[in-house]
Swiss-Prot record:
Subcellular location per the Swiss-Prot or TrEMBL entry: Cytoplasm
One function term, GO molecular function aspect: GTPase activity
Note on how the cofactor is bound: Binds 1 zinc ion per subunit.
Name of this protein: Small ribosomal subunit biogenesis GTPase RsgA
GO biological process entries: ribosomal small subunit biogenesis
Stated family: Belongs to the TRAFAC class YlqF/YawG GTPase family. RsgA subfamily.
Positions of the CP-type G domain: 104-274
Matching SUPFAM superfamilies: P-loop containing nucleoside triphosphate hydrolases
Quaternary structure (record): Monomer. Associates with 30S ribosomal subunit, binds 16S rRNA.
Statement: the UniProt record of this protein carries the keyword Protein biosynthesis: no
Keyword terms: Cytoplasm, GTP-binding, Hydrolase, Metal-binding, Nucleotide-binding, Ribosome biogenesis, RNA-binding, rRNA-binding, Zinc
Length: 353
């Protein structure tokens, strides 16, 4: 069966109609340039939906729309934006984010549906907050450190609530923290309640953009209150429950704050816990920095660094070169990753039925 060909005139009309539809779609999808002023530099201090709060060079904050051509925008991004002009009838038009500068770093977390999701940009360091209450867990600290190493962002370990320790307890905690000091990590002991140790922490935060990570109940919000000089109703905080020993997480959206002593912090609920299930086993291994000198020295190339004969890592543990707790936590992380990955595959396969 032969097909009727369009005449040249019909082809021109089809093309014109197509271009008109594209133009109409583009006009509906974005914003009129005449509604906005000159371009300026700014930083995103909060992002929600198709809007962002942008701080200009003079410190003023502007609620902005976001160009649909911008595929990714998160708190901490440095942007080019334009303020809105007064429209007809005195209606004020929001500003608009025109472009995003290249990121020096981006903090991401795994998402079961969206893959790896960015949550903050241009971070200089991740403050890993732990505490002796609800529990001092070296396993959790090690998980955060692996995540920091995988993202190539410098960590700072902060142990909160040291005011609850007696002399023997403080001695024990320092012995535990020496494990991390001895492999090059910075460790600070503080109390948000008594403000002990806050001066060294302020110095470590000055002139840097930091983000606080840690489980609920370790006192992240209380620590931020003390560092920012804010009252408790400005950054909400809940005391640890006497019954469960667990605090309640109260922050709901990532936001950038300025420290009075200099430096910035991004407070985000997205970094309460870093999932590691998206990482390869090799990335977990490389996340333990003290392993590096021994990798490649095992007797067998496919060494699992467990009970394998001739394992250089296990030999280093037996010789006191690698902390036994770190080696054990390494295997715990690998085991938990395998369990989550199996569960994830099952969930996705069942959802495809």
């Amino acid at each position: 069966m032969s097909k009727n060909k369009l005449s040249k005139g019909q082809q021109r009309r089809v093309k014109a109609n197509h271009q008109r539809r594209l133009k109409t779609t583009a006009e509906k999808a974005d914003y009129d340039d005449n509604l906005f002023g000159e371009t300026s530099e700014g930083i995103v201090i909060s992002r929600f939906g198709m809007h962002a709060d942008v701080e200009s060079a003079d410190g003023s904050v502007h609620r902005c729309n976001i160009r649909r051509t911008i595929r990714s925008l998160v708190t901490g991004d440095r942007v080019v934006w334009r303020p809105g002009k007064d429209a007809a009838d005195g209606v004020s038009v929001k500003g608009i984010v025109e472009a995003v500068h290249d990121r020096a770093s981006v903090l991401t977390r795994p998402d079961f549906y969206d893959g790896v999701k960015p949550i903050a940009a241009n971070i200089d360091q991740i403050v890993v907050v732990s505490a002796i209450l609800p529990e001092l867990s070296l396993n959790i600290i090690d998980r955060y450190l692996v995540a920091c190493e995988a993202q190539d962002i410098e960590p700072l370990i902060v142990l909160n609530k040291i005011d609850l320790l007696d002399d023997d307890g403080l001695r024990f905690v320092n012995e535990q923290m020496d494990i991390y000091r001895n492999i090059g990590y910075r460790v600070l002991l503080v109390s948000s309640r008594t403000q002990d140790g806050l001066k060294p922490l302020e110095a470590a935060l000055t002139d840097r953009i930091s983000i606080f990570a840690g489980q609920s109940g370790v006192g992240k919000s209380s620590l931020l209150n003390a560092l920012l000089g804010l009252s408790e109703d400005q950054i909400l905080t809940n005391d640890v429950s006497d019954v469960s020993g667990l605090g309640q997480h109260t922050t709901t959206a990532a936001r950038l704050y300025h420290f009075p002593h200099g430096g910035d912090v991004i407070d985000s609920p997205g970094v309460r816990e870093f999932g590691l299930w998206h990482l390869e086993a090799e990335q977990i291994t490389n996340g333990f920095v003290e392993f590096h000198d021994y990798l490649g020295r095992c007797k067998y190339r496919d060494c699992k660094h467990d009970t394998d004969p001739g394992c250089a890592l296990r030999e280093a543990v037996e010789n006191g070169k690698i902390a036994e707790s770190r080696f054990e936590n390494y295997h715990r992380i690998l085991e938990s990753m395998a369990q989550v990955q199996v569960k994830t595959r099952k969930n996705f396969s069942s959802s495809d039925d």
